[in-house]
Amino acid sequence: INPKTVLAWLIGAVGAPGALAGALVPIRESGSLIPQLLIGAWVRRHPVRKGFWALGAVIQGLCVLGMALAVWHWEGLAAGLAIVGLLVVFSLGRGFCSVAMKDVQGKCIPKSRRGRLTGLASTLSGLATLAVGLVLFGQDSEPGLLFYTLLLVAAGLAWWLAAAVFASVDEYQGETAGGGHALREAL
């Protein structure tokens, strides 16, 4: 969910005050990075970390589905505040994914294949974006609220599918020592 484009557009589409759109990027970025300072050491104490990524993906999917409900059922300030509030929780889930991803990838994907994996993921997401773009711009009229709500539902379900796939990864136990509590060390 891109806060600069998708969510900013959604804020306007539901008739929420435009000032809410200005808060989206800082919320997503700080809402993901700051909690990592708190949870990083705790996650590293667990030898198998794929569950944290899966949990983060489930949280993100739930938030995107919540945004779909907000867009469909509310308008104005209520819908805008719901989107912003759900983005806060979404960002916390994103933080779990960020903390766990590199460790799991480092243990499960050979170094020589990591670039290919990232490239494949980028290619598939680009093709999906292209398909949605063709649907959007291939019509004579602007798609309605139902179309955008269904896109959010599809995105939420995709997060849940990703959580299930990631949870099935055969991750071996890793190192649990080292890496202090980042917030304490920063202060």
Predicted feature residues:
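Juxtamembrane intracellular "pre-TM" segments in multi-pass secondary transporters
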Residues: 171-187
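Cytoplasmic helix-loop-helix junction between adjacent transmembrane helices
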Residues: 88-123
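Transmembrane alpha-helix termini and helix-breaking/packing motifs in multi-pass membrane transporters
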Residues: 8-16, 40-46, 68-74, 126-152
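Hydrophobic core of transmembrane alpha-helices in multi-pass small-molecule transporters
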Residues: 63-70, 77-97
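Helix-loop boundary and gating motifs at the non-cytosolic
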Residues: 1-34, 39, 43, 50-60, ...
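Alpha-helical transmembrane segments of multi-pass secondary-active solute transporters
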Residues: 21, 52, 117, 148-154
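Glycine-rich segments within core transmembrane alpha-helices of 12-TM secondary carriers
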Residues: 29-36, 63, 118-137
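C-terminal membrane-cytosol helix-exit motif in multi-pass small-molecule transporters
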Residues: 93, 136-137, 156-175
